[in-house]
């Protein structure tokens, strides 16, 4: 399993970004339609189901981290490692589904948990199998499969159900679950050929029980870190849902979703570079991570300024006056979102490449505690704006702490992490910009 070169990474990043952009565009269109059809309360139910389903993603993150570490750092057989990972995924899916069904327990006010429970095992498998595509350098293939199902394809299906069929919320949610089922089934095709032959003996991973035990030990810490990260990222949503009206939850989640549109670039870079960071030597992986972090934050600053200026106006004109309060909330969220866009890259290096999932777990626990305490302290007197301020404070703190630990673990100077460099611009684009500037100077003379 070889890492792609710089041109290959750029190609994969652009491909990932294009598919994410397609998915985001379709998701925004579907979101507008569902918000207008079902109002803030219905929008809140749909958003909350998606947020609850993220627990499947965090569980899969632990499995993915363990697989990437065993294949990338320990050089184990990919086939043997994945075979053990499937057993771990089955156990996690069973536990997660049962837990969500127990929380729902037939309560009509908790239907979000029912829909999330139905999609949970398929989502977990889909997220976990993504690491096979990353390590086997088949990112474009899984991008297309995801875009056609849980990405743009699923959103377009929801859009059609709402605008053409005028389907009720329950039918829309069933269709939402069905897209995860389809995506999980489709993603399994071709994996056997990608994995290659299985190895034998300790050098290739050892007995399945030994591989599984090591995965459980490593993956449990990585999954716990990912879960705590998610809770730190979304504890404000749970508190808003518990303390304020459903309509307020719908407004708040819309502000969050609007801000997270900026994360398309960072998600594309993280997804396409994960296999490379896992398999490169430590120094090269650290240099790549630092370059991506400083480049992403620089891009997000520009995007954040534009979204702060246009976001509130777009929300009112696209979603309706009932969601106008989301505009000021969005502006309060943006500073933290700009910095938090690099969190995934920093966390991946600390947990997977440096092999310190326990350290990451500790950092995320601190972030969760800070965000929860600040949200509880501010939501009473300031409402949604208090929750947004608490969220931003937690994001900024998390970024500063993780940058510090990344610098220590990798030996990278802070300047190389924080300050963009001319070399960060792709060579072809840099040469074109240089030629354009020279042409302008010549014309002025």
What label would you give each PLM region?
Residues 1-9, 140, 144-145, 165-176, ...:
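Interhelical loop/hinge segments that connect adjacent transmembrane helices in multipass membrane
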Residues 5-61, 220-247, 372-376, 395:
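Signature of the first transmembrane helix
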Residues 11-27, 48-107, 111, 276, ...:
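Membrane-water interface segments that mark the loop-to-transmembrane alpha-helix transition
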Residues 27, 31, 60-76, 135, ...:
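Helix-loop junctions and terminal segments of transmembrane helices
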Residues 40-43, 102-116, 309-341, 385:
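Interfacial segments at transmembrane-helix termini and the short loops linking adjacent helices
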Residues 49-58, 252-271, 300-303, 333-340:
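Transmembrane helix-bundle signature of multi-pass secondary active exporters and lipid flippases
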Residues 69-73, 122-146, 335-363:
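Membrane-interface junctions at transmembrane-helix termini in multi-pass inner-membrane proteins
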Residues 113-117, 145-196, 366-370, 384-408:
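Hydrophobic alpha-helical transmembrane segments
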């Amino acid at each position: 399993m070889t890492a792609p070169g710089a041109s290959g990474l750029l190609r994969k990043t652009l491909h990932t970004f294009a598919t994410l952009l397609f998915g985001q565009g379709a998701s925004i269109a579907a979101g507008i339609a569902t918000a207008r059809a079902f109002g803030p309360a219905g929008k809140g139910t749909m958003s909350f189901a998606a947020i609850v389903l993220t627990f499947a993603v965090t569980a899969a993150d632990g499995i993915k981290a363990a697989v990437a570490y065993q294949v990338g750092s320990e050089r184990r057989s990919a086939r043997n490692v994945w075979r053990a990972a499937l057993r771990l995924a089955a156990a996690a899916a069973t536990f997660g589904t049962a837990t969500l069904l127990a929380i729902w327990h037939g309560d009509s006010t908790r239907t979000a948990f029912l829909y999330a429970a139905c999609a949970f095992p398929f989502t977990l498998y889909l997220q976990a199998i993504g690491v096979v595509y990353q390590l086997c350098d088949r990112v474009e293939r899984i991008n297309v499969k995801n875009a056609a199902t849980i990405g743009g394809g699923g959103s377009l299906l929801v859009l059609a159900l709402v605008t053409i069929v005028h389907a009720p919320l329950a039918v829309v949610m069933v269709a939402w679950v069905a897209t995860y089922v389809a995506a999980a089934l489709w993603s399994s095709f071709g994996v056997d050929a990608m994995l290659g032959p299985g190895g034998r003996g300790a050098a290739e991973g050892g007995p399945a029980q030994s591989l599984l035990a090591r995965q459980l030990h490593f993956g449990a810490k990585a999954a716990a870190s990912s879960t705590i990260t998610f809770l730190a990222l979304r504890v404000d949503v749970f508190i808003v849902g518990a303390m304020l009206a459903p309509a307020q939850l719908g407004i708040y989640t819309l502000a969050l979703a609007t801000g997270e549109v900026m994360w398309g670039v960072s998600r594309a870079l993280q997804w396409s570079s994960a296999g490379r960071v896992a398999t490169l030597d430590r120094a090269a992986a650290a240099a790549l991570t630092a370059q991506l972090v400083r480049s992403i934050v620089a891009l997000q600053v520009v995007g954040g300024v534009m979204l702060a200026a246009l976001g509130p106006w777009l929300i009112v004109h696209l979603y309706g006056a009932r969601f106008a309060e989301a505009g000021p909330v969005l502006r309060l969220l943006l500073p933290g979102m700009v910095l938090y866009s690099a969190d995934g890259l920093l966390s991946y290096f600390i947990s997977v490449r440096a092999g310190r999932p326990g350290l990451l777990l500790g950092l995320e626990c601190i972030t969760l505690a800070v965000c929860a305490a600040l949200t509880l302290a501010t939501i009473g007197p300031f409402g949604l704006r208090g929750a947004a301020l608490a969220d931003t404070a937690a994001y900024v703190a998390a970024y500063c702490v993780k940058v510090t630990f990344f610098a220590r673990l990798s030996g990278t100077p802070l300047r190389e992490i924080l300050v963009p460099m001319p070399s960060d611009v792709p060579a072809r684009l840099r040469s074109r910009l240089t030629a354009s500037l020279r042409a302008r100077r010549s014309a002025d003379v």
